[in-house]
Design a protein with these regions (language model features):
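Pocket-lining segment of extracytoplasmic ligand-binding domains
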Residues: 86-87, 165-255
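Bacterial N-terminal signal peptides
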Residues: 4-15
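Signal peptide processing junction and immediate N-terminal pro/mature segment
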Residues: 16-22
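Secondary-structure end/capping motifs
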Residues: 220-300
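Conserved C-terminal helix/tail region of periplasmic/extracytoplasmic solute-binding proteins
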Residues: 293-326
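Short, glycine-/small- and polar/acidic-enriched structural segments
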Residues: 22-173, 177-183, 196-200, 205-206
Length: 326
């Protein structure tokens, strides 16, 4: 796929690919879907050498939409993906044989940022709102917020911008009245004088964010590789929670943010909320299914069909996480 090789070129340009001197191990390509703090577990595991310690030589690439991510996963271009939102569930409902095996963040790590003249959520009626993509976390969060305050989708104009930085730019230019952003872009927007109308993490929405997704085929044919990947991933999560200096340095590299105050704020907000064991939750997946109202099977599908936490449960039973956090 042409776009796949373009993504590889972008990663090389950003300096986020594996170096030629990386230790030998089983080669594996993994992808992440957004430039936000919730995606950092994967970066941390890579930069800390956690995957190498478990015999894996992991290359990371960036694929900016859930749809393309699933295409790459099903097509075999990547073996493992870290993606936010309901895209993996929608793909499975349509026949893609993929499953969630871990979730690094089980709530919406987003904020509705608006122009200063927006004083209440009801003021969003009739306004232009920025999201990343239809079907994304930003899309779901916006529609959830509007529905909760009796504002119909047709009463606002949704504009897609791709990444949080582009939504922020649209706010600055006045193209939109509000937009859903993720950290650290949220912190930058607040510093520029824009208003944080809603912090979704305070709303208490349980929703799968930063899911680790694989194909059924990979899970069945390469269970040991999947296990070793999750062990390295869990070590990345441990570094997130326990090593602020390293985490902020890695975030700065991948997010291309140099402002130390913004990195400090981002880390202090997210590190305490990251789980020790990245289990998916039934309630989160159930709500994600409810967000897929246009999918005929979503109403009757069972959350258990969409994830397999066997590896995590086995690791916990064997004492892996207890040893990690001793």
């Amino acid at each position: 796929m042409k776009w796949f090789f373009v993504c590889l070129a972008v990663v090389h340009a950003l300096g986020c690919h594996a170096s030629a001197s990386a230790q030998s191990g089983q080669k594996l390509v993994a992808a992440y879907s957004s430039l936000s703090a919730t995606q950092a577990t994967l970066w941390l595991a890579k930069e800390a050498g956690a995957f190498q310690r478990h015999g894996l030589d992991v290359d990371l690439i960036y694929i900016s939409t859930g749809t393309k991510m699933v295409q790459a996963l099903v097509g075999g271009d990547i073996k493992i993906s870290q993606v936010g939102g309901a895209a993996p569930l929608a793909a499975r409902l349509r026949g893609a044989e993929i499953k969630i095996i871990a979730v690094a963040f089980n709530t919406l790590a987003l904020s509705m940022i608006t122009q200063t003249d927006i004083r209440a959520i009801t003021d969003l009626k009739g306004k232009r709102l920025g999201i990343s993509r239809f079907g994304s976390n930003t899309d779901f969060g916006t529609r959830y917020l509007l529905k909760k305050h009796n504002i119909a989708d047709r009463d606002v104009t949704f504009l897609q911008f791709g990444e949080a930085q582009a939504i922020f730019a649209a706010l600055q230019s006045g193209t939109i009245h509000g937009g859903v952003l993720s950290y650290p872009t949220t912190a930058l927007a607040i510093r520029k004088g824009f208003k944080e109308l809603v912090d979704f993490s305070d709303v208490g929405i349980e929703f799968p964010n930063s899911e680790v997704v694989v194909t059924d085929r990979f899970l069945q044919s390469q269970p040991d590789m999947a296990r070793r990947f999750l062990m390295g991933y869990a070590e990345g999560l441990h570094r997130y929670k326990t090593d602020g200096a390293f985490t902020k340095r890695v975030m700065g590299k991948y997010l291309r943010v140099q402002d130390q105050a913004v990195l400090d704020e981002t880390y202090n907000l997210f590190a305490p909320k990251m789980p020790r064991i990245p289990y998916p939750t039934l309630n989160g997946i159930r709500l994600a299914l409810e967000s897929l109202a246009d999918e005929p099977r979503a109403k009757t599908a069972k959350p258990e069909e969409f994830y397999d936490d066997t590896i995590l449960r086995n690791l916990e039973r064997e004492g892996f996480f207890r040893q990690l956090y001793r």
